[in-house]
Amino acid sequence: MANPKVFFDILIGKMKAGRVVMELFADVTPRTANNFRALCTGENGIGKAGKALHYKGSAFHRIIPGFMCQGGDFTRGNGTGGESIYGSKFEDENFKLKHTGPGILSMANSGPNTNGSQFFICTEKTSWLDGKHVVFGKVVDGYNVVKAMEDVGSDMGNPSERVVIEDCGELKNPSS
């Protein structure tokens, strides 16, 4: 079976920046990939925090040029929240896949076995994160949108413009 593909339609400020399409490596990290996929579709409804388990409307709160774009905190919006479809946090599935370069999709965490909903998209090779963060996908289309997001980032991570996931979901025909 083909790996699932999901999308983000990104707003930068008030401008529609375009669509980012990501392949999720369900063949290597099925639990992590399924969490991200379900948070893209919103199919699991409301979480324990009382918020929709859905990336739609959430922001990329931390963008550091030459490093990564981080998002997925749909409960607090500032990097201190988030929730997985399995409850609050879940374990590191494995570290088989590496942070090999731009477009790699990986889980943000606050230490071992603290995966929730926060994730980041690498804009460079970040091998120092190997063995600490679970890689579970990659950008397969729309990397130009990620570069546009990176352009509004800062060394401290605070974007100069709000970067929002205006819409998201799963592409039903992953082979296309």
Curated annotation (Swiss-Prot):
Belongs to the cyclophilin-type PPIase family. The keyword Cytoplasm applies. Residues 7-170 form the PPIase cyclophilin-type domain. Its main location: cytoplasm. PANTHER family: PEPTIDYL-PROLYL CIS-TRANS ISOMERASE, PEPTIDYL-PROLYL CIS-TRANS ISOMERASE D-RELATED. PPIases accelerate the folding of proteins. It catalyzes the cis-trans isomerization of proline imidic peptide bonds in oligopeptides. It holds the Pfam family Pro_isomerase. It comes from Arabidopsis thaliana (Mouse-ear cress). Its EC number is 5.2.1.8. Induction: By wounding, and slightly by light. Binds cyclosporin A (CsA). CsA mediates some of its effects via an inhibitory action on PPIase. It is found in: Cytoplasm. Ubiquitous, with highest levels in flowers and lowest levels in roots. This is Peptidyl-prolyl cis-trans isomerase CYP19-3. It catalyses: [protein]-peptidylproline (omega=180) = [protein]-peptidylproline (omega=0). GO terms for biological process: protein folding; signal transduction. One of its GO terms (cellular component) is Golgi apparatus.
